[in-house]
Regions:
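Phosphate-group recognition and catalysis centered on beta-loop-alpha active-site segments
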Residues: 1-255
Length: 255
């Protein structure tokens, strides 16, 4: 499907419009509400609980944002819903609860986390959760297999591939050289057929994302915009931003 205008219209608040100084933590209902109040779209991340419930949370471990340690997939949904986030009254929400709270008021861009092990259960359950959601919503993932699966499971929802050009951060050491090359050079496009791309700001002006944008007509968003310098680069090379740490003006306000 073609990407709807709404996906490129409103700047996207990275994990919601969070601000720890205000007690508003990433990927919470409070962060979503603050984004809604400012008229921004919301990016959120989903992981699976031990009992297979789709939860809104970025890290695969609880340590950074809660008073607990260990992996998120070692606790069940009930335990996670009672887990308070540091410096906040929020707890970890289910994806279904998150959808109910947003209720179509602004677009949601949901990133499906993956361990790149071929397990598509989280993708399947995420697709099931959004089937009856009436608001604007798109899916994206770093994992080409997840992108391909979502595109088949819910073709009515825009689905995008998240990429970068080097994959030289240690977090990507588990990937083979051939996987990194395929993802960086977008050689998987015939299989994944994404509706849009989401590319790392530092690599935004590189050949693959720009060729895909100009020759294939793939809309291009970029992450994560934290400075005015990056914002100017994004305006030159991309169609949409995922931002954090400041309040950008709407592109329509600057016209």
């Amino acid at each position: 499907m073609s990407v709807s205008d709404w996906l490129m219209q409103f700047p996207i608040a990275h994990r919601g419009l969070h601000d720890i100084s205000l007690g508003v933590i990433e990927n919470t209902i409070s962060a979503a509400q603050r984004a809604i109040d400012h008229g921004f779209a919301i990016e959120c991340d989903v992981q699976s609980s031990a009992d297979g419930i789709v939860m809104v949370f970025h890290d695969d471990t609880l340590d950074r944002l809660t008073g607990r340690s260990g992996k998120i997939n070692q606790l069940n949904c009930a335990q996670l819903e009672l887990t308070e986030l540091l410096n906040s009254k929020d707890t970890i929400p289910t994806f279904v609860t998150f959808l109910e709270k947003v209720n179509g008021r602004v677009p949601i861009i949901c990133e499906i986390k993956s361990e790149f092990d071929g397990n598509l259960e989280l993708a399947e359950k995420t697709a099931q959760a959004v089937r009856n959601y009436r608001g604007p919503l798109a899916i994206k993932s770093f994992d080409p297999l997840v992108v391909a699966a979502i595109s088949k499971l819910i073709p009515e929802r825009p689905c995008g591939f998240i990429g970068e050009s080097t994959y030289d951060d240690p977090e990507w050491d588990f990937l083979s050289p051939s996987q990194k090359k395929s993802m960086a050079c977008l050689t998987h496009l015939d299989q994944t057929r994404p509706d849009f791309l989401s590319w790392y700001i530092n690599d935004l002006d590189q050949g693959p994302p720009q060729l895909a944008r100009k020759l294939l007509g793939l809309p291009l968003m970029t992450w994560t915009i934290r400075t005015n310098e990056n914002l100017q680069k994004a305006r030159e090379y991309a169609d949409q931003i995922v931002f954090e740490g400041f309040i950008p003006e709407s592109p329509h306000q600057s016209e």
